């Protein structure tokens, strides 16, 4: 976990949760843009499964005081969907090119329902047992599948930092979704080669998103390639949370 604290006049703390095949550095450009205005926490997502990942995030949230905006990238959306129900301090969710499953739904279910993404064919399993494996993106496939709008050097850095996700994380069913009770925002690119646009659109509308932003030509690596769009979405959520409540006196 990395934490950057500021005197933020009771603004919400922004907790950033990375997805599979990456680490917290995916958020670096976002952190640079927000650190002067918000207390930021970059969570270390274990990538071991829906339950352990959500439990890890929920434990971190218990150490955070005041209102929280949970921001998930890619598979990190599964973690915020589940952990968001475990803390009364979570006030909003932001899905950045992210998965937002329903109860009993897995990431694999979503990909099966909306085929067309290239991620599944790009995965290389490293068996842990007869039934379990760590999943990696095959060498040389990162740029095209995850980060096509990044320069090659940036995509190579992303690949060098790749962290595997446990196979059970993608097949495990989700719990009660926090997006059913919390305001939520979605931002994603229309050139995401790993998550089909139809899936992004479906999730955002199913969740009743306050706002949906689609970034032209953007890949899955939105926090790196389009950090301004991500930050604008987070700021929009924060503004809604900090609007004064009118004092209405009954007649």
Question: What does each model-found stretch correspond to?
Answer:
Residues 223-239:
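Post-His helix in hydrolase/transferase enzymes
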Residues 85, 89-90, 94-130, 166-170:
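Flexible "cap/lid" loop of the alpha/beta hydrolase fold
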Residues 9-50, 68, 89:
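Conserved HGGG/HGGXW glycine-rich cap/lid loop of the alpha/beta-hydrolase fold
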Residues 71-76, 80:
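Gly/Ala-rich beta-loop-alpha elbow adjacent to hydrolase catalytic centers
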Residues 214, 218-227, 248-249:
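Catalytic histidine-centered segment of alpha/beta-hydrolase-like enzymes
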């Amino acid at each position: 976990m990395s934490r950057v604290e500021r005197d933020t006049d009771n603004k919400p703390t922004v907790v950033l949760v990375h997805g599979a095949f990456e680490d917290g550095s995916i958020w670096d450009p976002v952190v640079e843009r927000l650190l002067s205005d918000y207390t930021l926490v970059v969570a270390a997502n274990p990538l071991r499964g829906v339950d352990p990942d959500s439990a890890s995030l929920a434990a971190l949230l218990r150490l955070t005081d005041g209102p929280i905006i949970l921001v998930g990238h890619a598979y990190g959306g599964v973690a915020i969907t589940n952990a968001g129900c475990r803390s009364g301090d979570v006030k909003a969710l932001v899905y950045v090119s992210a998965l937002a499953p329903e109860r009993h739904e897995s990431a694999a279910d979503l990909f099966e329902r909306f085929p067309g993404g290239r991620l599944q064919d790009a995965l290389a399993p490293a068996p842990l047992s007869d039934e379990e494996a760590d999943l990696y993106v095959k060498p040389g496939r990162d740029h095209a599948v995850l980060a096509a709008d990044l320069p090659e050097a940036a995509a190579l850095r992303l690949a060098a930092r790749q962290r595997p996700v446990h196979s059970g994380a993608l097949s495990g069913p989700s719990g009660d979704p926090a997006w059913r009770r919390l305001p939520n925002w979605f931002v994603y690119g229309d050139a995401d080669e790993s998550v089909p646009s139809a899936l992004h659109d479906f999730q955002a509308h199913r969740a009743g998103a306050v706002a949906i932003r689609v970034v032209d030509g953007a890949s899955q690596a939105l926090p790196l390639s389009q950090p301004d769009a991500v930050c604008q979405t987070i700021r929009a959520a924060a503004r809604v949370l900090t609007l004064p409540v009118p004092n209405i006196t009954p007649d």
